[in-house]
Amino acid sequence: MAEFRELLNPEAAALVGKAALRKASWRLIPLLGLGYGIAYMDRINISFASLQMNRDLHFSAAVYGFGAGLFFVAYAACEVPSNLLLHRFGARRWLARIMLTWGLLAMGMMFVRTPVEFYAMRFLLGVAEAGFFPGVIFYLSEWFPARLRARVISRFYVALPLSSTVMGAVAGPLLHLQGTLGLAGWQWLFLLEGLPSVLFSWVLWRLLTDKPKDADWLSVEEREWLVRELASEPVDSGHGEDIGKALRDPRVWQVGGIMLCYLTTTYAYQLSAPAILQRATGLGVTAVGWLVSGAGLAGAAAMLGNATHSDRTGERRWHVAVPFMIMMVAFAVSGLLRTPWVVVAGLTVAYVCNVGLQSPMIAVPGSFLKGRSMAAGIAAMNTVGMMGGFLGPWAMGVVKDHTGEYRVGLVALVVPSLVGAGLTLGLRVRRASSS
């Protein structure tokens, strides 16, 4: 290794670095993106299942919203320990374990009959999935330099809007299996969308590599370059391995507050989106599914474009705050106006902005955390944020039951959008190197 470092000139090092990053990107990002896309489908397929399930099981909007949100309470409670266990046992073992257990529980949702069973299964699903997303973000930080991180995260994270596209396309046909083999359409949806998680857990187990130094699919020079490049990166606060110091950093909790606002808007809308769109347009479930699919494709383009520009300029805050502001206006328009296609357009814009701000937002912690402190810091931020995943859908359900419509809930989402923009602009972090 020492001889290699001495002989390698800057031009050769740049070529080795490009090759290493290209191989890592093509090896890891598709694997993790597909895993996260499957997870996201299992997390929010309940939004389509509810179109039949709530009627069959006599669930009110408040019961549905509370149960849907309990997933995030469990996720938040278990996230920090799960992410620390990932750091201890390695990403390959821990992420594969997460996928296996959540896949089995996602399939088990088909057996729900009462509100208590619904609450219990959603809670257990949150326990099972806890740590997957922050674990992946930590894992990517172990492989890619900070200057590329928003772009890398967006390529992984683009699985989220694309999974919405796939879910929108398949939900209608699955729900139309109503009565096949004596099962309701919503039961088929849970069964057939949970099975891929179980199967893909084996793929992660076989193909992931914990750290660059262990990657036998890289050359010796490429492994050496990645290890040295990542070890040489500057960090604002120098937390390193000091978890306690990282958790005392107010920026950790400020980013957590931004995530809280973000996830409140995300799941208040997305877990009710099919019902809102069906009510606004009068369309059937298949047509509503295609509306969701179209929004997913637009969101994927926005995510990649915003993340790429953020990396090229090295700027993070405005790439998060501006989408928050546009989203605020879009929710207000969707809630205050009644013209069906104006509502659809407003909600599509809100979704696109919501998805578009994610990668720059998630890239921020890498500017002041690293190592075990990053694992704990990201998990702590996401834990705070995940409470928005509980509050958003529950509040939307309560408002729907009391007013008979979703319009008031949509207008209320202006508040977390505005607060999220303000917290973002008040954040003080080192500007990332442009690339």
Regions found by a protein language model. Name each.
Residues 58, 90, 111-117, 128, ...:
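Helix-breaking motifs and short loop linkers at transmembrane-helix boundaries and internal kinks
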Residues 77-116:
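Conserved MFS/SLC helix-loop-helix module at the cytosolic interface between two early adjacent transmembrane helices
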Residues 316-364:
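C-terminal transmembrane helical hairpin of 12-TM major facilitator-type secondary transporters
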Residues 153-175, 196-197, 382-392:
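Glycine-rich segments within core transmembrane alpha-helices of 12-TM secondary carriers
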Residues 87-99, 311-324:
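Cytoplasmic membrane-interface "Motif A"-like loop-to-helix N-cap segments
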Residues 121-158:
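Cytoplasmic helix-loop-helix junction between adjacent transmembrane helices
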Residues 78-90, 302-315, 400:
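Helix-to-loop junctions at the C-terminal end of transmembrane segments
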